[in-house]
Amino acid sequence: MDTLTAISRWLAKQHVVTWCVCHEGELWCANAFYLFDAQHVAFYVLTDDKTRHAQMSGACAPVAGTVNGQPKTVARIRGVQFKGEIRRLEGQESDVARKAYLRRFPVARVLPAPVWEIRLDEIKFTDNTLGFGKKMRWLRDSSAQQA
């Protein structure tokens, strides 16, 4: 199994992403339920334009973040660190992503918040179940690397 496939399978089983934005020297983090799109290597999240992180993001901004479980032992630690770009989706792109998001999280139908895409450009996946400190790396537009 290649690196991106292994990472994608794990991300598909999780549901909360943390991402951080920086604007004019100020940092802010946010958490949200996400839908992972393995084909585009992106998360889709819903968040209101009035939130601090959305206002700091504007239409598009660089981001970094994490997805992790809550294991009880070090030997079971698995998690992703990433960097990429967040942007507010519009039009048909937004409609398609919202439809997919609502299939996974039907309760979100009552939320009028816009859809945002977090495009992942670099991923580091730590998976201690494969051996302590096992890391897999993926970069957009390049072949996967293992460390």
Curated annotation (Swiss-Prot):
Domain of life where this protein originates: Bacteria
Protein's name in the database: UPF0306 protein YhbP
Gene3D superfamilies linked: Electron Transport, Fmn-binding Protein, Chain A (2.30.110.10)
NCBIfam families given in the database record: PRK03467.1
HAMAP family the record matches: UPF0306
Similarity comment: family membership: Belongs to the UPF0306 family.
Coiled-coil intervals, chain numbering: none
Source organism of this protein record: Salmonella arizonae (strain ATCC BAA-731 / CDC346-86 / RSK2980)
